[in-house]
Design a protein with these regions (language model features):
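Active-site-adjacent alpha-helix of alpha/beta-hydrolase-fold enzymes
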Residues: 407, 425, 440-472
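Short aromatic-enriched loop/helix-cap "lid" or pocket-rim segments at secondary-structure transitions
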Residues: 285-289, 329-331, 382, 394-401, ...
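Post-His helix in hydrolase/transferase enzymes
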Residues: 478-494
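Catalytic histidine-centered segment of alpha/beta-hydrolase-like enzymes
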Residues: 328, 473-480
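Flexible, membrane-associating and regulatory peripheral segments of lipid-active enzymes
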Residues: 2-305, 311-354
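Active-site loop/turn elements of alpha/beta-hydrolase fold enzymes
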Residues: 321-323, 390, 439
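Serine-dependent carboxylesterase/thioesterase catalytic core
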Residues: 277, 326, 336-429
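Hydrophobic/aromatic beta-strand patches that form the interior of the parallel beta-sheet core
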Residues: 274, 317-319, 384-386, 433-438, ...
Length: 506
């Protein structure tokens, strides 16, 4: 393969060659002529777009809503249909006996940790003059909201795997609705965690999925998937709908806790694009448009721009994981632990059933290499790998990390003697398209210090084309507009990768 070193000033011309608009053809060979046919199509999830179009064009009264199955309601919610506002649903209300969150939480049985947390949540502080008070109970009672957050985190972790309905009953669905609606405007952590937990709950059997689609959650989710206050709200609401539809047999894959579906085309995807962020990044932050001004067009450019500029149906997924510079506890995961976790989740999401393209920033490139080493079948399906400022041979930040407190496993991976790069080199010939993007502007470090986070000699992989981008480390993956040099590289890379994927069909 010929290898090119291309300066960023030459890249803007690439943009116009790949720009096109993709409009899926939603027409049917049969045609829908009556509201009964539209309802039947929605219930069978056949020609759903045409059925929705028929209903919107003919504007029948809402009496047909009672004929829609939970599956049809889920499809409507997933598409953000306004029809969900008119569906009769079960109210998410608490029983008269459940006057507080603590009484509701007491119904769930999640083991000793849960019982201990419940006791702490409901404890009452002793007055100082009460000599019979147990030692350590003179302190003010802990914040109810803080304890509720901790208990909800525990529930989220416990529901990442299948659970016994006897331990977490169906009442968890209205409970999470109440948590979300009560704290949406006052505590983002609690409201987002309620949504994340519901996305796990949706996978635990038809009763939970049906409860979601026939309760107050239905109109709320249909609104959130389109008009959520944040990208996180929109992505998690989409995940809830997809997971519930998987449980009901409509969708043949699952979106586990670390996987987000950024874009899903109307047609069968030709490829899966997997985005992996880097150190201190996140799926809701790393892939946003560069926000140097107040005129922000996109909070997730892969989701908003790529479907407009790539004329092929593609599914776009994002992996999300915590990554830090410094370690204050012993609970952070190593690269191998994360890779093992992601292997299971990618398989559940159906990644590997079709050609795969990876787009990775910084540490995300190392994680992708670990995944491909551990999953030979996934490596065979990989047609493209874009390294964006990935430290293949270490970074000065690792040495800096040793000098402050306790560097994390993530920082230690940036050492030059890390053997991962050498191991991956042995299998990289199997990947037809490999591209490297290199940062060329210094980043702010500490105080007035500046420096290149990932120097050129480390960011350039041994194979494939190389592009130098005039940006700092954390912005090299954030194009400011669709004519940006960095975005042109992405389009060029995707075009080449999709061409390779199409060759495999012949």
């Amino acid at each position: 393969m010929t290898r090119y070193i291309i300066p960023s000033v030459a890249l803007s011309a690439i943009y116009s060659a790949y720009r096109s608009y993709y409009y899926p053809d939603s027409t049917s060979a049969f045609g829908i002529r009556t509201i009964e046919e539209a309802v039947a199509s929605l219930n069978a999830n056949v020609n759903a777009l045409e059925a929705l179009h028929f209903i919107q064009q003919n504007k029948p009264d809402n009496s047909f809503m009672c004929s829609l199955s939970p599956t049809a309601l889920g499809v409507l919610a997933l598409r953000g249909s306004e029809l969900c506002k008119h569906v009769p649903v079960t109210r998410c209300e608490i029983d008269e006996d459940d006057s507080t969150f603590s009484t509701i939480l007491a119904k769930f049985n999640l083991g000793d940790e849960w019982d201990s947390g419940m006791a702490w949540l409901s404890r009452v502080a002793c007055p100082e003059e009460d000599l019979a008070c147990p030692e350590g109970w003179f302190a003010r009672r802990p914040s109810q909201v803080l304890r509720l957050l901790q208990l909800l985190r525990l529930m989220f972790l416990k529901t990442e795997v299948p659970f016994d309905p006897a331990h977490i009953g169906i009442e968890v669905v209205p409970f999470l609705y109440l948590i979300y609606t009560q704290f949406r405007d006052t505590n983002k952590d609690l409201s987002i965690l309620a949504l994340k937990t519901l996305s796990n709950i949706a996978l635990n059997g038809p009763p939970y999925a049906i409860s979601i689609f026939t309760s107050d959650w239905l109109p709320l989710l249909s609104s959130l998937v389109v008009n959520g206050k944040s990208l996180e709200e929109r992505l998690i609401s989409h995940k809830i709908c997809q997971n519930a539809l998987n449980t009901l047999g409509v969708v043949n894959y699952q979106l586990r806790s670390d996987i987000y579906e950024l874009f899903l085309p109307e047609k069968e995807p030709e490829v899966d694009i997997v985005m992996i962020h880097g150190l201190r990044g996140g799926v809701a932050y790393t892939w946003r448009q560069k926000d140097h001004s107040s005129n922000i067009v996109s909070d997730c450019w892969p989701k908003d721009w790529l479907p407009l500029d790539i004329p092929h149906p593609m599914r776009i997924l994002g992996l999300d994981y915590p990554s830090y510079l410094m370690q204050f506890t012993g609970t952070l995961e190593s690269l191998q632990v994360r890779a093992d976790r992601f292997k299971r989740q990618l398989e559940a999401a159906g990644v590997g059933r079709r050609p795969v393209i990876f787009i990775c920033h910084s540490l995300g490139g190392l994680l992708a290499k670990r995944l491909l080493l551990d999953l030979p079948e996934l490596a065979k399906q990989t047609v493209g790998l874009l390294f964006i400022a990935t430290p293949h041979r270490g970074s000065p930040i690792a040495a800096w990390g040793y000098s402050i407190l306790h560097p994390t496993e993530d920082v230690l991976l940036l050492l030059e003697e890390n053997p991962l790069n050498e191991d991956f080199f042995k299998i990289s010939d199997k990947i037809p398209v490999i591209v490297s993007m290199v940062e060329t502007k210094q980043s702010d470090l500490i105080g007035t210090a500046k420096g290149i986070i990932v120097p050129t000699q480390s960011a350039v992989y041994e194979k494939g084309a190389v592009y130098h981008i005039e940006e700092v480390h954390h912005n090299v993956c954030k194009p400011s507009e669709r004519t940006s040099p960095s975005y042109a590289v992405v389009l060029n890379f995707l075009r080449d990768s999709i061409q390779e994927a199409r060759k495999r069909k012949i």
